[in-house]
Amino acid sequence: MAAGSGGSGGSGAGPGPGPGPGGGGGPGSSGPGLGSGGGLGGGGELHPRTGRLVSLSACGRTARRQQPGQEFNHGLVLSREPLRDGRVFTVRIDRKVNSWSGSIEIGVTALDPSVLDFPSSATGLKGGSWVVSGCSVLRDGRSVLEEYGQDLDQLVEGDRVGVERTATGELRLWVNGRDCGVAATGLPARVWAVVDLYGKCTQITVLPSEPGFSPPTPVPTPPLEPLAPPEDSALLEQGTSVDEAFMVSPAQARPETFPNSLDSHNDFASMELSEVVSNAILSAYNGGLLNVSLSSPPAGDGLASSGPATSPILTSNDALLFHEKCGTLIKLSNNNKTAERRRPLDEFNNGVVMTNRPLRDNEMFEIRIDKLVDKWSGSIEIGVTTHNPNSLEYPATMTNLQSGTIMMSGCGILTNGKGTRREYCEFSLDELQEGDHIGLTRKSNSALHFFINGIDQGVATPLTPPVVYGVVDLYGMAVKVTIVHNNNHSDRLRRNNAILRALSPEGALRRAAPAAQAEPERLLFHPNCGQKAAITHEGRTALRPHATDDFNHGVVLSSRALRDGEVFQVRIDKMVDKWAGSIEIGVTTHNPAYLQLPSTMTNLRSGTWMMTGNGVMHNGTTILDEYGHNLDRLKAGDTVGVVRREDGTLHFFVNGMTQGPAAWNVPPGVYAVVDLYGQAAQATIVDDVEVPPVSEPLPEGNNQMSPSSPSSAAGGSDLRFHQLHGSNAVITNGGRTALRHNCRSEFNDAIVISNRALRDGELFEIVIQKMVDRWSGSIEAGVTAIRPEDLEFPNTMTDIDYDTWMLSGTAIMQDGNTMRNNYGCDLDALGTGARIGMMRTAKGDLHYFINGQDQGAACSGLPPGKEVYAVVDLYGQCVQVSITNATGPMDNSLATSNTATEKSFPLHSPVAGVAHRFHSMCGKNVTLEEDGTRAVRVAGYAHGLVFSTKELKAEEVFEVKVEELDEKWAGSLRLGLTTLAPEDMGPGAGSGPGLPPSLPELRTKTTWMVSSCEVRRDGHLQRMNYGRNLERLGVGSRVGIRRCADDTMHILVDGEDMGPAAAGIAKNVWAVLDLYGPVRSVAIVSSTRLEEPEGTQPPSPSSDTGSEVEEDDEVEEQGLRGQNQVGIVPTALEFLENHGKNILLSNGNRTATRVASYNQGIVVISQPLVPHMLVQVRIDFLNRQWTSSLVLGVITCPPERLNFPASACALKRAAWLLRGRGVFHNGLKICEKFGPNLDTCPEGTILGLRLDSSGGLHLHINGVDQGVAVPDVPQPCHALVDLYGQCEQVTIVSPDPGTASGKIAGTQGDMEKADMVDGIKESVCWGPPPAASPLKSCEYHALCSRFQELLLLPEDYFMPPPKRSLCYCESCRKLRGDEAHRRRGEPPREYALPFGWCRFNLRVNPHLEAGTLTKKWHMAYHGSSVAVVRRVLDRGELGAGTTSILSCRPLKGEPGVGFEEPGENCAPPREEQPPPVLLSPSLQYAGAEMLASKVQFRDPKSQRTHQAQVAFQVCVRPGSYTPGPPSAALRELPDQHFSPSELEWVTKEKGATLLYALLVRVE
């Protein structure tokens, strides 16, 4: 046979000479010629007439759709000339966008483009048009074939697609050089190619045919034997007959001989021989091991023969699917390609499915196992049957069928239900896992073959009936399978590797001696990897996609053997915290192509060396125990590597540093292996040139990667943009450049983030390279603590409401809220070439740099020890940025300098936060300095008005310090609140629209002010003799203003609250000051939050959860000490590295996890416990398999050198522990029934320990102090946690600012404070944690809450959530272990807990708290009615009074106490005697219907009618009441626990009661 090599003429087919220069059959050839053509095959250029949005270029060979961001159609192009038969019109996709759905459509049309009226899309072509759209074939716009070929919508840039009209009038589609089969028949003789640049496809280019490749019309092919070269004999081994040997698929013209060298003159110069072989095998495999004839030859050509070898191949394109008729428990989906057994945990059979049509000869029927369950024995069975599914009565299992059925079950073959081959193959179907593939094919010689993961298992039976259907039995463990078609790219790759694994090395690795030294092949991961692993990014990245579901089966190997001295290095990209253990690395002699990969490489017993943890293992046996750095402690961004030296020694690297020789006499030719085990979820190969060797290790620290940082010794930085980004962003230039495509049609969705977390003091700097003037707004930059893998990219980063800090324009935003305006730089004002940098300091401050200049601290308080990533939003005008060379670590002095911090945050600010600023609108004599934190009156005595930059929030304090006085003037500083927005005032000189000269004249909007000791509203006197006289302020005096939640204005002088100055303050008010008279200069000393002094701080919600116990006297003494004493708040608590052997630390040593057994889980806080420091841990996970739970305590011996026992109770020296409800010292119980039972604390509970000033150890639960557990604890001591029994994970949490100090918590009003009586106190004192408490689902609690909301009571009367309420229903009280009665007061008196009620805790005014809420007061209840609840709350006590205890403001309407100026000689009003108040220590009596009337209401949720009662829980001053018998007529005593003579208390004294809680009961 002559093989012609054609030029532009293409390929000729048929006897006789070939046409011109084209290749054809030579004269006298015995068979048809097989040419290899070039050229375009007709219609090489596009017709100049196109759709209205198409522009042509490159001599009519490139077409581009204009305005791709606004339009998705009108992109039709046609070939210039009609197609010639047998020639493929091929185009390459040059560009796609993500804005639309749908993509390129291609086909042919009989319509002449010269006269065609172009429709908007190809589907609108009529009059003889065939178009392939997606995976459907349409004729004149109507679908004629579904599930055809490859889905065109899935093609990417660079893919090639073409159409061909054959000589027989068939339409064929070609995708990337592969024939997809016949798409249509009966085409006219004259058709033009048509391409629609639709949807995502925006640009294509017409391609010439590739050299040496021609897609001819299917031609008869002579028998294989004369063509089989000697080199192919190895491919026909292993029992493969001659007529089963492969032939080249129609997608490739077969070369006359396989090359025996890779010289440049050979057409295969760019391919390795093994690739040629494997592609040829794959082509034959995908073609079903083709018959001798590809189509029926013409009569009389001498090629016809009898038998299967000459039978014509079916040309039907019916997709192989599951038949709609199936087993009774089968559910079909995915267009009948997926079958799933219903109720897999209840039933194990009735799961038979069959194919929708008979199998063709050599057709592969392959399925993938999608889901298995572990309940049953046995698993999937697969085979063929002669029974037609339409007439078959499906059996429970196919092995019950006694005729016409061949099944593979386990590792054997069953024929008609009886075993015919017991050991058919070495694989058992019962051992296959999810993701494995099983296939079968009936060969043309009637032999049946099964395939497992692409590997042919040989002949199962030599004789198979000619008409058989594929059948699958989803039996036992098998639940779900999916049919896999051969056109799936990943399946092709997998099968290719599987076939190569089955081949012998000699057959697959034939190499010719290279003539010259070739460039070394790049190291990649081999595609054959573990079951739970995947290879991405062209073989450079390996990952476990479901890393949180499984911890092993993540083994990956290098694609080739390592050369001597060649370093194989990977970077850890992603880690998870769920598992123990981490990445393992090493080498193996096993070729990855033939290796059956184990679940973990340490299970391999031959030819393997692995570094695991800090040890080295050879063939599964440890050979070095203490070697190098512990791999289990590496973090994301660290690198590990391995190298085999020429002398046979094996060395490992961690972050570029050699760990020394690990093994000797390692043979050459080993493959690198990485085991993505446990926490390691993703790793990427790093070339030697990308990470230079690190010269010397850096000291470890909390904020450094261990043991050294990859970029610390390099001149450049490894910081890049992450591969994950917003939908409109594009990452180029090796990850150093980010741009927003469609920049004139899209302005957002272009967020990019750094590829790793920033280190402390490390600068991330970008340069703006391109901008457009179309939009408003520009680049936004900042940091986020959200990992890129966990970030669901929003439209803009300011949409994220957690763990994110951004600079937008001049505004600093945290979690989407503006924290401050007028920062030192304006990002919206930057242009092309400007550089923006961001850096987190070691102190937790965020600094921005503009063109290298530090702009000062933007915000502080970034979470210590928590990773933050740089994030850039290419928003609005900013289109493109690149990372600069300045990115990397900066000088340490800059990272820790206080100069920039002082500029933005005054050092005397009580709380670190965003400091207040003065608004730029101010009086004409005022100058603002120090970034708006200092105001100076430069002339005169007036025109000194200044405003806050933003509105004051509820309870926010705006405070200034007097810096300069000018004694020649009289008067005082004036301050107050105004509804006038400063930006609404224009510049003026004291009249008209400008600012007035003094604050009393500011009357355009409502203004409240204090001047000297007078309170004025809009200049009118409201009150005299208020607080301290402001005329007496001196240099250093502090004065502040607060808008309270009860709509009152308070003035603070030197931290002391002067009480309410005015009421009825509007919601939106600004602070206003008048630098009048002697006060010349003030400076802001407040932040957006104020740490209040002891005496003025309201009760913290954290202490009002339900505690019934009063603190000791020492707590009150603390409250009388200096007001400036601040509780110590730890900044970076972490667990000590020395811990129990079953402990794994993570999250910067802030999370401890017990990874095995139930003990050996002791951890110690590394920092000593000092007085007033609250150390808290949160219970993250409980394992109900065990009993008991965590143990808390302190130890006074040095923990660094302590050998921890199995449990904390075994500590016999210097240990004080809290376990269950007991207190233990050195293993001996010294107190029982202390506080709540720690064994019953649910997940989410926060437990804390604190030392008071006298050394007493306090236990805190969910922020509530449980009292002194151990007095006089020696110091120094360390907090200890034992993760015992159920408790498997805890995390250190930072305390709330208000509760870090013991004295603060101690002076807060508890809900029900009672004394320690015989060491016993109520166990209800810890409330449910906010997120994980089982009480969250209490229906009774929710019902009572809905009723309380119906009362429409002001929220300010009640404690804020989550300390707002406590439920005493049967289930909730039993869960807490509440006792029915408690004792309280001096002398002690018993009272009953409000069982059956729900308690809503009331606020108590801080001024009255110290004088009234003492441990000497008793607790009682008062039955009430809904009608009087609001009146009682307004008064603040049950008896009539003139002062509201809740607000300390005079009641409205009472004489002599209004805000109007009183007369000079007014006599005080006569007070009325309050009526007697009935109380009871028992709520069963106080809540009786005659004392607490019932009211009917409809539940808004369920619409059911209920009855409800209300009552008050009050504190009663001892001696102010008279006990006696019940006055209400009762049939029997409601509470037998109390004596009848003391069941009712009566008091007439004013101020004898203090409201504590509102109680609600619903029937």
Curated annotation (Swiss-Prot):
GO terms for cellular component: centriole; mitochondrion. One of its GO terms (biological process) is mitochondrial DNA repair. Residues 1107-1117 have a biased composition (Acidic residues). The modification Phosphoserine is found at residues 504, 909. Residues 1-49, 692-717, 1087-1121 are annotated as: Disordered. Promotes CCP110 ubiquitination and proteasome-dependent degradation. By counteracting accumulation of CP110, maintains normal centriolar homeostasis and preventing formation of ectopic microtubular organizing centers. This is Neuralized-like protein 4. The gene is Neurl4.
